[in-house]
Regions:
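Short alpha-helix
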Residues: 184-200, 204-205
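A short acidic, Gly/Pro-enriched loop at the edge of an enzyme's catalytic core
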Residues: 121-128
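Conserved Class I S-adenosyl-L-methionine
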Residues: 204-266
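Conserved class I S-adenosyl-L-methionine
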Residues: 1-59, 62-69, 155-177
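A short, conserved alpha-helix within the catalytic core of class I
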Residues: 136-149
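Class I SAM-dependent methyltransferase SAM/SAH-binding core
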Residues: 72-118
């Protein structure tokens, strides 16, 4: 297969948004995203990404890290435990506000707002270029740029499997499948790995499998379900029966792929 075919596999059929539209979309999601991630009952520092960084000694105290699509700064905060020289970039200024607050005690932290492809062009500027779950990496040229600005490693994290039994109960009640979540787009990882390979690098892939207990509410579920008005009423009624003191405890079954490659062959 030609490398361009893997790019098509990597891309969803979602229409491309203008930068100003994307900024508005992610600004509007920032508070929801922050609250949702902060509610997760997990020790984030135990995630496979940071175990790999530690075991492979990818970073030292002088290393420079770039997080593309850093969001509210969860990964940046963990990277700052290895090095103070962390840079976060995001298209959403409100996401960056949360990140700035989270890393206010890390002296060397930098935050760059806007289109990362326009803002980062310097060759070999960072020791590690990282991206997790971001739509900002969707083309061959994006991956090439990651390799250009890194002098050592590139690392990406993506969902390849996601299961929520409560969503499955809703499907059974409605007698149909719900809309596919972005977190189940495992084809992205397949396309990404093959693009990196075809560019001449040797990507390693690791799987991070875990069960996460997450505190949700009716709104959290409804924001991710496409349905008719009649179905909406049924789903809300069903979810309210699951609620205890306004909270729904969700058990999520998750597999994430972590792809790591060295930009230096030797």
């Amino acid at each position: 297969m030609k490398i361009e075919e893997f790019e098509k596999i990597m891309q969803r059929e979602d229409r491309e948004e203008k930068q100003e539209d994307l900024e508005k979309i992610w600004d509007s999601k920032s508070e929801w995203f922050f609250k949702r991630t902060e509610k997760k009952q997990e020790n984030f520092s135990d995630r496979l990404i940071f175990k790999i960084v530690k075991e492979k000694k990818l970073l030292n105290e002088n290393s420079k890290v770039l997080d593309i699509g850093c969001g509210t700064g969860r990964h940046l905060l963990e990277f700052s435990k290895f090095t103070s020289y962390v840079t976060g970039t995001d298209i959403s200024s409100r996401m960056l506000d949360y990140a700035k607050e989270k890393l206010k005690n890390v002296n060397e932290t930098k935050f760059i707002h806007g289109n990362w492809m326009k803002n980062f062009t310097k060759e070999k500027e960072f020791d590690l270029v990282f991206a997790s779950m971001t739509p900002a990496i969707s083309k061959i040229e994006h991956i090439k740029r990651m390799c250009l600005i890194s002098k050592n490693y590139c690392m990406m994290e993506r969902f390849v499997y996601y299961r929520d039994p409560i969503r499955e109960e809703i499907e059974k009640m409605l007698g149909r499948k719900l809309n596919k979540l972005h977190s189940n787009h495992k084809e992205y990882t397949y396309g990404l790995w093959n693009i990196v390979w075809n560019l001449g690098y040797f990507p390693e892939i690791y799987l991070d499998k875990y069960i996460s207990e997450t505190e949700k509410n009716v709104i959290d579920y409804m924001e991710q379900i496409i349905c008719t008005d009649d179905e909406e009423n049924k789903i809300i009624e069903f979810l309210k029966e699951k609620e205890k003191n306004g909270k729904i405890m969700s058990k999520e079954y998750i597999i994430k792929a972590v792809i790591l490659w060295d930009v230096n062959i030797f």
